Swiss-Prot record:
GO cellular component: cytoplasm
UniProt: L-aspartate binding residues: 117, 121-122
EC number(s) on file: 6.3.4.5
Gene: argG
Domain of life: Bacteria
GO molecular function: argininosuccinate synthase activity; ATP binding
Keyword Cytoplasm: yes
Lineage, highest ranks first: Bacteria, Bacillati, Bacillota, Bacilli, Lactobacillales
Sequence positions that bind L-citrulline: 85, 121, 125, 173, 258, 270
Main location: cytoplasm
The protein's name: Argininosuccinate synthase
GO biological process, one term: urea cycle
Family: Belongs to the argininosuccinate synthase family. Type 1 subfamily.
PROSITE patterns: ARGININOSUCCIN_SYN_1 (PS00564), ARGININOSUCCIN_SYN_2 (PS00565)
Cystine crosslinks: none
Length: 399
């Protein structure tokens, strides 16, 4: 009897490995793993999926697409959820969903499965994205639906010949891509516990970072970082290199108690050395090149966009409309930011741009000053006129 095909988002971990063994009883399982920049060799995942029982197994390198189509808009939007979290995991989910749907179409599959639990954000992100891309596809979430304990999963794995991951005793749950690393669980679940050094991987402790600062130049063209210290790189490779450089100085550690979409609070440890450095540099070039009105209005949309992405609404029309506006603003974001990295701190210490709106002759207090100070008298009178009229009408007799 021919089975229906199901495309599984496969990580190689216990949950999705057990899912293959479970699903293959009723489906032909097609395992798909996306390389979004974990920095690991994922070939073993391809072989493991086939060994467990998948009929096909894909490992797809999507680092460049992830950087260009998802990370870049977030960088240009200065996207921080709750002003702290640069949306590390949230940014990869719409791309992973898109690839799952594409492969489902290619293989004639009408089902997609993921390994998310029922209390996280990712189940929402995957299922809403898949529904937006193809509402006819049915999504199955084995881990959420089983209600199995960890012990029951391990027992099932042993009974069915599923390899047990070597790091099963690791107390942490980690997700990593180009844009950073997210870590939760274990001792981190108590917000009073300081995160131990073992919870970090991409960054050195700021106390152990070099005693001398390092200066780097980041070049932007139409809002896109195109070169690091004068060396032109693809966006993905620039981020990878910057992760190494900034991570060595303890840059990008974030300890955040955040409000999850599903209604609970979660304590997360993030490491985003490249992201935090790029975000600081990009903001400074914007400050140099934007007119005041764009500088003041853009953050309103940035905050709304951050919430939309975090909440799994990348493919919502509101998200796409905001992204279109933000892309339009980037035409003038050209220049070089000189960044100082020192013991966990990022500081842009110099910047230049051919589109700079900073006029030194207008800003100076020296004899080279070209600002017409006499014009200020009339400006103040007109600017303050509504306030003056209000006082004359409504504050009579007020001391």
């Amino acid at each position: 009897m021919n089975k229906n095909k199901i495309v599984l988002a496969y990580s190689g971990g216990l949950d999705t490995s057990v899912a293959i063994a479970w699903l293959k009883k009723d489906f032909d399982v097609i395992a798909v793993c996306m390389d979004v920049g974990e920095g690991k060799d994922l070939q073993f995942i391809h072989e493991k999926a086939l060994k467990i029982g998948a009929i096909e197994s894909y490992v797809i390198d999507v680092k460049e697409e992830f950087a260009e189509a998802f990370v870049l808009p977030a960088l240009q939007a200065h996207a921080f959820y709750e002003q702290k979290y640069p949306l590390v995991s949230a940014l990869s989910r719409p791309l992973i969903s898109k690839k799952l749907v594409d492969i489902a179409h290619e293989c004639g599959a009408t089902y997609i499965a993921h390994g998310c639990t029922g209390k996280g954000n990712d189940q929402v992100r995957f299922e809403i994205a898949i529904a937006a891309l193809d509402p006819t596809i049915e999504v199955i979430a084995p881990v959420r639906d089983w209600h199995w304990s960890r012990e029951e999963e391990i027992a099932f794995a042993k009974e069915n010949g599923v390899p047990i991951p070597a790091d099963l005793d690791n107390p942490y749950s980690v997700d990593q891509n180009l844009w950073g690393r997210a870590n939760e669980c274990g001792v981190l679940e108590n917000p009073w516990n300081q995160a131990p050094e073992e919870a970090y991987d991409m960054t050195v402790s700021p106390e152990e970072a070099p005693d001398r600062p390092e200066y780097i130049d980041i070049t932007f063209e139409a809002g896109v970082p195109i070169a690091l210290n004068g060396k032109v790189l693809s966006l993905a490779n620039l981020i990878i290199e910057l992760n190494q450089i900034a991570g060595a100085h303890g840059i990008g550690r974030i300890d955040h108690v955040e409000n999850r979409l599903v209604g609970i609070k979660s304590r997360e440890i993030y490491e985003c050395p490249g992201a935090i450095t790029l975000l600081a540099a990009h903001k400074e070039i914007e400050d140099l090149t934007f007119v005041r009105e764009v500088s003041h209005f853009k953050p309103i949309l940035e905050n709304e966009l951050s919430n939309l992405i975090y909440n799994g609404l990348w493919y919502n029309p509101a998200t796409q409309a905001i992204l279109s506006y933000l892309k339009e603003t980037q035409k003038v974001v050209n220049g070089i930011a000189k960044v100082k990295l020192y013991k966990g701190h990022v500081q842009v210490v110099a910047r230049q741009s051919d589109n700079s709106l900073y006029d030194e002759n207008l800003a100076t207090y020296t004899s080279a000053d070209s600002f017409d100070q006499e014009a200020a008298i009339g400006f103040i009178k007109l600017w303050g006129l509504p306030t003056q009229v209000n006082a004359q009408v409504n504050k009579k007799g007020v001391v």
